[in-house]
C-alpha cells in the first residue's frame, strides 16, 4: 500500500541502508517479488515502485516541471513535437532500494521505441535520490536528466478506453539499462503484468491523454511511495455526458 516517505524508509530501507553497494547489487537490487495481478479496470495501477515526484494535467507544450528555469514539457518528455493531447502525467522516481520491475497499469497492446541520450552520456540521478532519502523532500533542481537521458516510450493501446496511454522509462547514468522482457512489438498485456526492468536509479512516468468519455482522478499526493501493480494511481469514471448517452441508448 502507499506509504509516506518516512514510513517507507523506516519499514523498507532503514535495515539495509548500511549494507555495502556490492551486497545491495548482488542480493537486493535485482529482486523480483511475486505479486498478485489485480484486475480492476476502474483504475490505473502504478507502473513502478518509487516516490511520486509530480502529478498534474498539462497541455502538450506547457511545463510539467521547470528545472533551474528551463521548462520540461510533454513534448520534451516524449521527444515528439507533434504530440497534441492535454494529458495527466505522473512521475515516479525509483531509488536504488526499490524493486525495478515495471508493470502494466491498464490492459492493452504495447509497442515501444527506444530514444538515445541527447548528449554523449546520460546524466546521473543521484542528487535527486540523495535529497529524497537524506532530506525527505523532493527537489527538481538537479533533474536535468529529464531533458537529456536515454528513454523508452511505451505506447499502450486500450480497446476498453478507446485510446492509448504511455509509460515513459528514463534511464539513469548507465546507458542501455532499460530491458524489455519481450522484444516483440504489438504484444497484449494484462493489468499488472511485468513488461520491463530498469537497472539502478531511474524514473517512470505514466502519461494518460484526457478523454471525452472518461474522467481521470488522482488518488495520491506527491511524496508518497507506491508499488507497481499494487497501488492505484488514477481512478477512472464515466463523464456525465457519456453516462447520459449510455442511459439514452438503454
Model-based region annotation:
Residues 1-250:
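Contiguous, well-folded functional domains in the mature portion of proteins
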Amino acid at each position: 500500500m502507499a506509504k509516506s516517505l518516512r514510513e517507507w524508509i523506516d519499514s523498507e530501507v532503514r535495515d539495509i541502508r548500511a549494507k555495502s553497494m556490492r551486497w545491495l547489487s548482488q542480493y537486493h537490487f535485482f529482486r523480483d517479488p511475486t505479486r498478485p495481478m489485480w484486475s480492476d479496470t476502474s483504475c490505473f495501477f502504478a507502473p513502478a515502485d518509487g516516490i511520486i515526484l509530480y502529478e498534474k494535467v498539462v497541455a502538450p507544450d506547457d511545463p510539467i516541471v521547470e528545472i533551474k528555469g528551463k521548462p520540461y514539457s510533454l513534448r520534451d518528455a516524449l521527444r515528439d513535437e507533434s504530440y497534441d493531447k492535454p494529458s495527466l502525467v505522473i512521475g515516479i522516481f525509483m531509488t536504488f532500494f526499490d524493486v525495478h520491475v515495471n508493470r502494466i497499469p491498464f490492459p492493452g497492446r504495447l509497442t515501444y521505441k527506444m530514444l538515445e541520450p541527447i548528449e554523449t552520456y546520460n546524466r546521473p540521478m543521484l542528487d535527486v535520490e540523495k535529497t529524497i532519502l537524506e532530506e525527505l523532500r523532493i527537489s527538481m533542481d538537479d533533474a536535468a536528466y529529464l531533458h537529456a537521458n536515454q528513454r523508452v516510450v511505451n505506447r499502450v493501446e486500450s480497446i476498453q478506453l478507446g485510446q492509448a496511454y504511455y509509460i515513459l522509462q528514463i534511464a539513469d547514468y548507465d546507458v542501455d539499462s532499460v530491458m524489455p522482457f519481450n522484444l516483440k512489438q504489438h504484444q497484449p498485456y494484462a493489468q499488472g503484468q511485468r513488461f520491463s526492468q530498469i537497472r539502478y536509479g531511474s524514473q517512470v512516468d505514466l502519461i494518460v491523454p484526457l478523454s471525452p468519455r472518461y474522467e481521470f482522478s488522482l488518488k495520491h499526493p506527491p511524496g508518497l511511495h507506491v508499488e507497481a501493480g499494487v497501488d492505484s494511481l488514477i481512478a477512472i469514471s464515466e463523464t456525465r455526458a457519456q453516462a447520459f448517452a449510455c442511459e439514452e441508448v438503454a
